[in-house]
Amino acid sequence: MNRFKKVFFIILPLLFLSGCFLSKNKEEKTKDTQKEVIEVEKRPITNRIDIKSATYASDIILDKLSKSEDKAYEVTKINNLSQIESLNFDIAVVPAYQVVDLYNKTNGNIKLAAITVLNNIHIISDKQINNPTEMAGKTIMVPELNESMNKLIDSKLGFVKTLMKINTEFYYSQKDIIKNLENSENIIAFLSEPYYSKAITNNNYYRFDVNEVISMIPNSKTESEGDFVSDVIIVNKNYLRDNKDSFDKFLAEYKNAQGEIKEGDVLSQGIINNYDITNEEAISIFKSMDNSFIDSDTMAGVFEIYLDKLENLDKNIFSGNRPSDDLYYKR
């Protein structure tokens, strides 16, 4: 029983440890340097800062910044990380769990500059689960993570999937999870905002607190207290090299805009269409989130604790490539 319990309560926080989902691009990327140079040359010539948005909260904040009078920011919503991996950006807001993978794939050519959202992790089920035996026959609905996370999930589930007839379904988009929830039973689903709020509207799902789940892991080395890092700002070193003042200005403006979002603000139609929610719902959900702005030494300390949590779940998760202090941008 203890073995089942340990596996169950490890996979709950693990499957969605970092919060908001962004799927990993599955297409093979070219290694032809000449082709990469040509692609860069085709980018339009502009003095505007190229910002990529990969999370819900950043979509709303950057929408506000993009409407500023000086038109300094060129904001693009992205659905995969291919442009980040090829360094085709100046600044980006991405899910925290992608940072180490991106750092290694870009040969260390990014820096982490700020933590902007915490605790965007939500676990729901249509049934109460009081002990591991009640996991039997359940379907776990999970947004697809990156390769290292997916391998970690499989290794933790192991033989229990077959023995307890647990079915794990990975989804390219949380939109698909929402659709399937409507006609599914005996499920556990992992969601981030705004999909979590959409799922629980008019539905009586049981909700699980991630920290409480972690505290139930027998002999766990992972601390059950503290916040989970969800959204972060990263910067391209090539841009940062000659634009430190400009980047510092962006960080200050992002922080200010984050605190200025209020009821009555009118969002761009693209956001409303993409998330299939009303303007009022979008603002309300944003305001309910744990929006924060942590930078410099405090950010580095918080993120190191986050990386420690991952390593305590699996000591080989970074395959010996855990970033050094060079990862952090400190003003």
Residue ranges and their predicted role:
Residues 97, 173-269:
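Pocket-lining segment of extracytoplasmic ligand-binding domains
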Residues 308-331:
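Conserved C-terminal helix/tail region of periplasmic/extracytoplasmic solute-binding proteins
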